[in-house]
Regions:
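Juxtamembrane transmembrane-helix termini
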Residues: 13-19
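Extreme N-terminal signal-anchor transmembrane helix of membrane signaling/transducer proteins, especially
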Residues: 1-13
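The feature marks either
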Residues: 9, 23-180
């Protein structure tokens, strides 16, 4: 029985150490993913485009109202798009004007999912986070249809729980979902 207790304690200790290590890797991977997204967004920071935003004024308050929908002028006239609270909370950029500008930029200069994955993998290696990574990108078009791309294509990882999700664009129409497996 003493041998069984010793083995059980050793196994429990290994399990707890691994669980703690995975939690640390997950935090490092989340931070690296967000940094990689910012690196891709920053490549477009100096690009000038015409973007008209109405309804904005110079007055702000400390308690900015979180929008539950936005209005966008399309070829079909003014369209109302609902923004889920979850999407807004996980949006890379919160300020309406900047989200609108970024949404217009991404229409003209889309992010390369392959480049984003390469940058994320590089940051993971720098942080010594092992394992495999995958990015699922979902774009919601003006008619609210979704188009999904996974890089690399690996159905087994997509079925697992995601590590983190970030949204870009005025309507939060660009969804980037990060997956890792150790």
């Amino acid at each position: 029985t003493l041998c069984l207790l010793g083995t059980s304690y050793y196994a429990w200790t290994l399990y707890e150490a691994h669980r703690k290590q995975v939690a640390e890797w997950n935090e490092g991977a989340k931070a690296a993913f967000e940094e990689a997204l910012w690196m891709e967004v920053d490549k477009r920071a100096e690009t000038s485009i015409f973007h008209y935003s109405s309804g904005e004024n110079g007055m702000t308050t400390l308690r900015e109202k979180i929008p539950d929908s936005v209005f966008v002028m399309t070829v079909n006239g003014w369209q109302k798009y609902k923004i889920d609270r979850h999407k807004y909370d996980n949006s890379l950029i919160k300020e309406n004007r900047k989200r609108g500008h970024l949404g217009a930029l991404l229409e003209m200069y889309p992010l390369s999912i392959d480049t984003l994955l390469i940058q994320w993998d590089s940051l993971l290696a720098d942080r010594q986070v092992p394992g495999r990574s995958l990015i699922r990108y979902i774009y919601t078009d003006w008619e609210l249809r979704d188009d999904t791309i996974c890089v690399p294509v690996d159905e087994r990882m997509v079925r697992s729980d995601s590590l983190t999700t970030r949204y870009l664009g005025f309507r939060c129409e660009h969804e980037f979902v990060a997956y890792t497996s150790y």
